[in-house]
Curated annotation (Swiss-Prot):
Biased composition regions of type Basic and acidic residues, renumbered to the chain: 269-278
Function of the molecule: May act as scaffold protein. May stimulate ABRA activity and ABRA-dependent SRF transcriptional activity.
Localization per record: Cytoplasm
Single GO MF descriptor: actin filament binding
SMART domains in UniProt: LIM, VHP
Consequence the record notes for mutating residue 227 to R: In a pancreatic ductal adenocarcinoma sample; somatic mutation
InterPro entries: AbLIM_anchor, Actin-binding_LIM, Villin_headpiece, Villin_headpiece_dom_sf, Znf_LIM
Residues annotated for Zn(2+) 3 binding in this entry: 212, 215, 232, 235
Domain (HP): residue spans on this chain: 543-611
Protein name from the UniProt record: Actin-binding LIM protein 2
Biased composition (Polar residues): 393-404, 473-488
A cellular-component GO term for this protein: cytoplasm
């Protein structure tokens, strides 16, 4: 590689025939007149320029890299080597030590600031390089021990002769002997020692490292312990106030959450206050009975198309947002008033999807045997009739009133309504617009009841009625036998029955025949479902049927609303897993999972992304 500083005159052979002409290596044209020669190549003066900046290279130095000609400034900028000490580019002789490069004059002892003589021993103590004279006072101990330490390598055990040496772990090492004990990687920068042996950072963490339970990264330096959990000091944050924990400060650990003691106490106080009041934005109160003798109130909330009771709401985590909560002042309630046949028969059929709605009602005592129809508007569809048992005597038999074309008596308030009926409320009074699914307890029938009912009438019936005394109901003069027949041309399927023919005496529901004109309502009872009402959702594992979905379609990956199948229970996504997939995800059977505490189940569900 050479640079031609002065243009050379073209010799006479350049003006020979084209077959012997000399071509420019850059432009490919014939060289005439003054040309430059670089090694065995020829260039026009104007064609010999820097590949990077285009400056003229005829008068200055240049470098050749992969057949390209580059000026000095651009070559140093692109490919040059800097001195570790002065940060200037190195040209000419280079000194390399511990993976770093220096000018010969810049590689000096850190103590006496003198350059190292050629062939002299260099000692590196982990931070600085020292000459042989300055490194002697560093070691502590007898001169014999010092001499032995200087002569033998801590890695190979052989004598360290003239040359560079490295001081680490109170030993001297050949530069090529200071390696990771596990992978054998040469350690020329940071390392971590364990039992007097050096390890690279990756192998040390793989063998002895501790992971942070919050960020799941390895912890180096200070570590905060809470029980069996470990955290970076910056990762251990109170779930309530979001502040870090000071050194020596007490911590309250619950599941995977950590609290300041004061924050935990404040949260408990808030939880107790929340149990005694209902939020107008998140829950609605549905009366168990509208009579003055109603013994209880049942609290529901509408979440993502599902109706949740108070147990389900209490199981929801505080960090999970609740969507689609219907305001209680938007739900229409009407007094229990008897209405004409036209009001009871005018129902419109709209586009509705199947959504379950838990309904529980308690019986109300009454001293009269008369029955009147009332109105209750949770939906605009599926007008189910509920009848309640009699009063103290237990012999008052509720029955379906006979509907006729004659004008009914004036509307009056009744103290003990026993039939619940959906009136013609239209779209404006109904914000749910979903067909309810009525559920009932499956248990024993009371001893005093007669269980004989005609099997054919059971299959035809599509209305739920509180079962009274069978003989009294059959002989009741208020029951019109003509109204028990099915209208011709009406296609209805019977309600699905729970396993077993007996029901709990507290909820002695039975079936009665439909009212006249039932086929005109456009109602479809085929989706009616009988399931336990008000029972513990966990206890109803074997009673309620959960549709099986693959694990991938049930995963909740973040805190925003996730698109899940419509018919899944968002509070119990794990119930929609098959037993085999449940065992694979949680490492236990369903029965073992149900026996765990609630906080433990929620913690496992969070780790499985099903919470």
């Amino acid at each position: 590689m050479s640079a031609v500083s002065q243009p050379q005159a073209a010799p006479s052979p350049l003006e020979k025939s084209p077959s012997t002409a000399i071509l420019c290596n850059t432009c490919g044209n014939v060289c005439k007149g003054e040309v430059l020669r670089v090694q065995d190549k020829y260039f026009h003066i104007k064609c010999f320029v820097c590949k990077a900046c285009g400056c003229d290279l005829a008068e200055g130095g240049f470098f050749v890299r992969q057949g390209e000609y580059i000026c000095t400034l651009d070559y140093q900028r692109l490919y040059g080597t800097r001195c570790f000490s002065c940060d200037q580019f190195i040209e000419g002789e280079v000194v390399s030590a511990l993976g770093k490069t220096y000018h010969p004059d810049c590689f000096v002892c850190a103590v006496c600031r003198l350059p190292f003589p050629p062939g002299d021993r260099v000692t590196f103590n982990g931070k600085e390089c020292m000459c042989q004279k300055c490194s002697l006072p560093v070691s502590v101990g007898s001169s014999a021990h010092l001499s032995q330490g200087l002569r033998s390598c801590g890695g190979c055990g052989t004598e360290i002769k003239n040359g560079q040496a490295l001081v680490a772990l109170d030993k001297h090492w050949h530069l090529g002997c200071f390696k990771c004990k596990s992978c054998g990687k040469l350690l020329n920068a940071e390392y971590i020692s364990k039992d007097g042996l050096p390890y690279c950072e990756a192998d040390y963490h793989a063998k002895f490292g501790i992971r942070c339970d919050s960020c799941e990264k390895y912890i180096t330096g200070r570590v905060l312990e809470a029980g069996e959990k470990h955290y970076h000091p910056s990762c251990a944050l109170c779930v309530r106030c979001g502040q870090m924990f000071a050194e020596g400060e007490e911590m309250y650990l619950q599941g995977s959450s950590i609290w300041h003691p004061a924050c935990r106490q404040a949260a408990r106080t808030e939880d107790r206050n929340k149990e005694t009041r209902t939020s107008s934005e998140s829950i609605i109160s549905v009366p168990a009975s509208s009579t003055s003798g109603s013994p209880s109130r049942v609290i529901y909330a509408k979440l993502g198309g599902e109706i949740l009771d108070y147990r389900d709401l209490a199981a929801l985590p505080k960090s999970k947002a609740i969507y689609d909560i219907d305001r209680p002042d938007m739900i229409s309630y009407s007094p229990y008033i008897s209405h004409s046949a036209g009001d009871r028969q005018s129902y419109g059929e709209g586009d509705q999807d199947d959504r379950s709605y838990k309904q529980c009602r308690t019986s109300s005592p009454s001293s009269t045997g008369s029955v009147s129809l009332g109105r209750y508007t949770p939906t605009s569809r599926s007008p189910q009739h509920y009848s309640r048992p009699g009063s103290e005597s237990g012999r008052s038999t509720p029955s379906l009133s006979v509907l006729s074309d004659s004008k009914p008596p004036p509307s009056t308030y009744q103290q003990a309504p026993r039939h619940f009926h959906v009136p013609d409320t239209g779209v404006k009074d109904n914000i749910y617009r979903k067909p309810p699914i009525y559920r009932q307890h499956a248990a024993r029938r009371s001893d005093g009841e007669d269980g004989s009912l005609d099997q054919d009438n059971r299959k035809k019936s599509s209305w739920l009625m509180l079962k009274g005394d069978a003989d009294t109901r059959t002989n009741s003069p208020d029951l019109d036998t003509q109204s028990l027949s099915h209208s011709s041309g009406t296609d209805r399927d019977p309600l699905q029955r729970m396993a077993g023919d007996s029901f709990h005496s507290r909820f002695p529901y039975s079936k009665s025949d439909p009212l006249p004109g039932h086929g005109k309502n456009g109602l479809d009872q085929r989706n009616a479902n009988l399931a336990p009402c008000g029972a513990d959702p966990d206890a109803s594992w074997g009673m309620r049927e959960y549709k099986i979905y693959p694990y991938d379609s049930l995963i909740v990956t973040n805190r925003i609303r996730v698109k899940l199948p419509k018919d899944v229970d968002r509070t119990r996504l794990e119930r929609h897993l098959s037993p085999e997939e449940f065992q694979e995800v949680f490492g236990m059977s369903i029965e073992e999972f149900d026996r765990l505490a609630l906080w433990k189940r929620n913690d496992l569900k969070k780790k499985a992304l099903l919470f």
